[in-house]
Amino acid sequence: MRFFNKYKLFLDCAYKHLNIVLLDFKTNTVVDQLTIPVQQNLTELAVYHLEKLLKKNKVRNNTVRQFYVTTGPGSFTGQRVGAIIAKTWCTVNPNCQLFALNSLRLQIPYGCGISKISAGNEKNYCGLFTETTSEIALLAKPDFVKLCKANTELPVYENFENIDSIEELFLNNIERFELVENPQNLELLYLKDPVN
């Protein structure tokens, strides 16, 4: 009988980049990763690059045992694309567990901090994360400034700009992802209505 390696797969397309990270299941060693900016055709690009990365590394779909996805806030299209791929993957491959984490929490590499993702129209998705607090809100710029002034001891992370790598963020937060028992019950984090 032939045995295949097992893997963990991370997909994030909730903001301005398509991020894919493939990990060895046992060691959490990065096998491969991809980060590319996307503006158009996200659905086609996500599926194409995911298939390409798996083929390049000779990974069979049924050897991915854990699928990690971000739930937003961020791009409405990006959130939905990530969710659809994750739900479909775990439904078709029932031995694969689904884990989810919001994008604001993912942006903070270590423990505590203030996370901000631009929401357009002078507003920001903001998260305050301490040992005892986990608050998420849509804030206008003056309110974000107040939040930062009230928490000067916390580092601020903005728009995934001051990070070393997405794989580092993923690895540092892997224990914060929550198991989604039924993939069809995956919920996305929307803080504002879609733009018409």
UniProtKB/Swiss-Prot annotation:
Q: Which organism is this protein's natural source? A: Mycoplasma pneumoniae (strain ATCC 29342 / M129 / Subtype 1) (Mycoplasmoides pneumoniae)
- Reading the lineage from the top rank, the first entry is Bacteria
> What is the taxonomic lineage of the source species?
Bacteria, Bacillati, Mycoplasmatota, Mycoplasmoidales, Mycoplasmoidaceae
Q: Which Pfam families match?
A: TsaD
* Protein name listed in UniProt: Uncharacterized protein MG208 homolog
NCBIfam families per UniProt: T6A_YeaZ
Q: Which GO terms describe its biological process?
A: tRNA threonylcarbamoyladenosine modification
